[in-house]
């Protein structure tokens, strides 16, 4: 079976700076792949390439076997790829439920005229979106259920804002979730909960997931495979233990070779 997502020999540069170099990467159905690497490794650029924010100079990006290179971000989302961000992008003055409904509106058929006139079809779609939002929020249990539907997003804890960001991604009817540092800024208890949640997204909700994460405890706990980048190059791929102990990965994080040269 072909991978759900596949990058073939993808390269991206900004001026003279090569940010991604000849990258091959794939994510299979119902698989969690974590991407690690020091700052400047090219991780965020990778997400921007997959979601259509950037276009590669070379190579191809396939989703469900079809190229998505050149498609705008909204069409890539419609294809089934949704993304969360390291810096949360919620509508803080809207309620929890309204935030999720807003994410789902991209899949409605109603145009401006139908929306203004409040046609029967538009009202039916709103009921469907309302039910969809409640379904996605129910996945998070008491953290986002019940009375929290009517809470404004700014009143949520940081961890629950993270959950809401994921719920919004789920509401786009995605098959592939791109999670950008989902555990960033969380305490150990919250980090443990988000680790369990990511596994649940795969095991119970059936998502395939590509994750950028700096917390190695999270990476170890969720990953089917780990890919390490450094200056846009893939330097290791395999299980967590294989990648974490790979000499090039140790060097990228700790500068072992540089330290050894200084000691000579």
Q: Where do the model's predicted regions map?
A:
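Glycine-rich phosphate-binding loops of nucleotide-dependent enzymes
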Residues: 2-264
